[in-house]
């Protein structure tokens, strides 16, 4: 199940600015020491999982895959004690989680995935689930041990639900999702300190309410649990859970999704889901996300996080800040090219097409030919027409698996282009 060599290729920087030379030498030594520590497997599973998720923001996967593989092999051969099973379960789940982050980096959708990532993701999710069930059959477990087992059982079922949904197995996805919700609740009831459960519950409850359709009707009685879901994820961030890197990304996306949700159009300004309030929170979260993870010293082989810039680009574009939006989209494109060329990552071509469409959209919205500039107006109308054709033909500015979200975004951008077209009398 080794996938790391297929995903990441280490490459030293060709040149360094003289001003930073001394500090880079020190950092290089510290990084080497850290990698050696990882290889020796000195980190407990929960600590390793937390550090690995943070490193995933910088596309640093390889040392963690190696560590997880080594620890899983060692623990599989060890006596089947409760403590060993807890560690093994956590490493299985952490491995699946890192593969999930690889799939996000490559921009997997139901139409684009690599078996070299998707199959191990399913495998390690199943192994985490199996190990959790073995644990729960043990006699004499403490409430804390039971809570941990239910936490990872629910988390693994959530992963399996996501995988099965992508494979088109809706029934299995619904069943595993329902089980995940119940088991995460059990984890919190047994031990409220299992704060990671908040992230899983938030994803499940918001996601089912916002995107679920039939599954929301079956699993949640059709109830609108969007706000409850958002609050769970807020709690995961407030309590500084290990899942905070994922919680930030998810919560920002969900807040963007609420701004374009037509169900919110007639809400009172005092309603927590009022679009302007969701916009304000999205901007706050983007600033916090940047300050917490992307404002430190320059990192080797890292030029930026494409998810952060993609969210920033969309928010700026929704706000009508098209110059900023274009700049952020261009940064996403730069990062995609870097990941493809320098790290040999197979980025979904549709993501790149969507980003290019975003850049074109911003360019069009920035056009401002004078009333007497007939050539400029004709040129603008031609470009606007091409972009309208792109959107009408199924093109997307965001490669998102939810048809509902794609449709809502298309409507917003299509409407803006139509208004610009009318302004120029195209």
Cite the ranges covered by each PLM segment:
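N-terminal secretory signal peptides that target proteins for export/translocation
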Residues: 1-9
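Residue-level recognition of tetratricopeptide repeat
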Residues: 81, 146, 194, 242-244, ...
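Generic helix N-cap/helix-start motif at coil->alpha-helix transitions
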Residues: 41-44, 209, 242-247, 301-311, ...
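Terminal, low-structured helical/coil segments at or just beyond the last alpha-helical repeat
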Residues: 350, 357, 361-426
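Boundary at the C-terminal end of the N-terminal hydrophobic targeting segment
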Residues: 28-32
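Bacterial N-terminal signal peptides
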Residues: 15-23
């Amino acid at each position: 199940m080794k996938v790391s060599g297929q995903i990441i290729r280490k490459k030293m920087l060709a040149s360094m600015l003289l001003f930073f030379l001394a500090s880079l030498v020190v950092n290089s030594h510290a990084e080497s020491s850290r990698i050696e520590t990882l290889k020796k497997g000195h980190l407990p599973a929960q600590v390793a999982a937390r550090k690995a998720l943070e490193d995933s923001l910088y596309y640093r996967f390889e040392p963690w895959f190696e560590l997880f593989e080594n620890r899983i092999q060692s623990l599989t051969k060890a006596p089947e004690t409760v403590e060993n099973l807890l560690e093994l379960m956590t490493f299985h789940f952490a491995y699946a989680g890192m593969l999930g982050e690889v799939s996000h980096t490559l921009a997997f959708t139901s139409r684009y995935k690599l078996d070299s990532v998707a199959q191990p993701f399913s495998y390690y999710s199943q192994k985490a689930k199996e190990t959790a069930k073995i644990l729960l059959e043990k006699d004499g477990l403490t409430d804390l041990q039971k809570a941990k087992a239910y936490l990872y059982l629910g988390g693994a079922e959530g992963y399996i639900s996501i995988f099965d949904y992508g494979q088109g197995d809706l029934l299995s996805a619904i069943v595993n999702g329902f089980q995940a919700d119940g088991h995460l609740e059990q984890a919190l009831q047994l031990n409220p300190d299992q704060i990671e459960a908040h992230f899983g519950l938030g994803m499940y409850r918001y996601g089912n309410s916002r995107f679920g359709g039939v599954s929301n009707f079956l699993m949640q009685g059709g109830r609108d649990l969007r706000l409850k879901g958002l609050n769970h994820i807020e709690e995961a961030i407030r309590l500084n859970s290990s899942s905070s890197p994922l919680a930030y990304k998810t919560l920002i996306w969900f807040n963007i999704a609420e701004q374009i949700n037509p169900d919110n159009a007639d809400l009172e300004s005092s309603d927590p889901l009022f679009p302007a309030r969701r916009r304000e929170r999205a901007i706050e979260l983007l600033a916090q996300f940047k300050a917490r993870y992307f404002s430190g010293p320059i990192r080797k082989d890292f030029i930026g996080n494409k998810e952060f810039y993609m969210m920033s680009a969309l928010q700026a574009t929704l706000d009508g800040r098209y110059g900023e939006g274009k700049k952020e989209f261009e940064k996403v494109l730069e990062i995609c090219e870097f990941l493809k060329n320098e790290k040999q990552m197979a980025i979904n071509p549709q993501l790149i097409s969507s980003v290019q469409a975003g850049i074109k959209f911003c360019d069009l919205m920035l056009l401002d030919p004078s009333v007497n500039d007939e050539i400029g107006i004709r040129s603008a109308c031609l470009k606007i027409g091409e972009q309208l054709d792109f959107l009408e033909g199924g093109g997307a500015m965001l490669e998102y698996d939810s048809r509902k979200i794609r449709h809502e975004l298309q409507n917003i951008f299509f409407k803006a282009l139509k208004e610009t077209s009318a302004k120029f009398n195209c």
